[in-house]
Amino acid sequence: MAQAVEEWYRQMPIITRSYLTAAVVTTVGCTLEIISPYHLYLNPKLVVQHYEIWRLVTNFLYFRKMDLDFLFHMFFLARYCKLLEENSFRGRTADFFYMLLFGATVLTGIVLIGGMIPYISETFARILFLSNSLTFMMVYVWSKHNPFIHMSFLGLFTFTAAYLPWVLLGFSILVGSSTWVDLLGMIAGHVYYFLEDVYPRMTGRRPLKTPSFIKALFADDNVVVARPPNAGLGAGARFGAMGADPQAQ
């Protein structure tokens, strides 16, 4: 069992493996009280006035306490991050890293701006961690790149992957969870999808071209990961019971 887990971990592409590792280490560290979530959450005042710049990064690494929901989120993160990196961004590690950087920037900007708008500022002030939103963004982008994969929800009904974000949003409403996390991820995902995929087809210009200094960070990355035969199988959502129809491949 341990060997299988180690092999699964080693086969992950570099960005997925790094993000998953950082998320697990951060959450475990908080659970063991080695570090405190109070030193990690997004706080604009502390960032600007006290130069606690690390909060711009650490708020994307903490997934709350370690419980069943945490395990679902880790599976969710590992699956869709891996699917994107191995397929849509196959051989383009720098572009994938830039996508995550862009998404994190958009999410942070939305929360900061929302916190300055009357009537909704209190809602945004309660958003302390954006890790789930960034994961949801990846799900949204994946669904846009794979809209025709057939999936099922708890065996109750089937749908195509294009509707996956909306199904997850509906599930959040059903169980009484805050929908803001999902909505922010959808907004960031759609902004990226429009600027990277739709706008270039309309105008011939690509506004999100990955900067050369980011490409230089991954200049030695020549590994192209082959797509696994069941890459489209299973959505593995927070409820852990969603799967794709293999006949749709």
From Swiss-Prot:
Keyword annotations: Endoplasmic reticulum, Membrane, Transmembrane, Transmembrane helix
Pfam families named among the record's database cross-references: DER1
Cellular compartment(s): Endoplasmic reticulum membrane
Chief localization: endoplasmic reticulum
Positions on the Lumenal side per record topology: 43-96, 144-152
Mode of membrane association: Multi-pass membrane protein
Annotated family: Belongs to the derlin family.
Function: May be involved in the degradation process of specific misfolded endoplasmic reticulum (ER) luminal proteins.
Name this protein carries in UniProt: Derlin-2
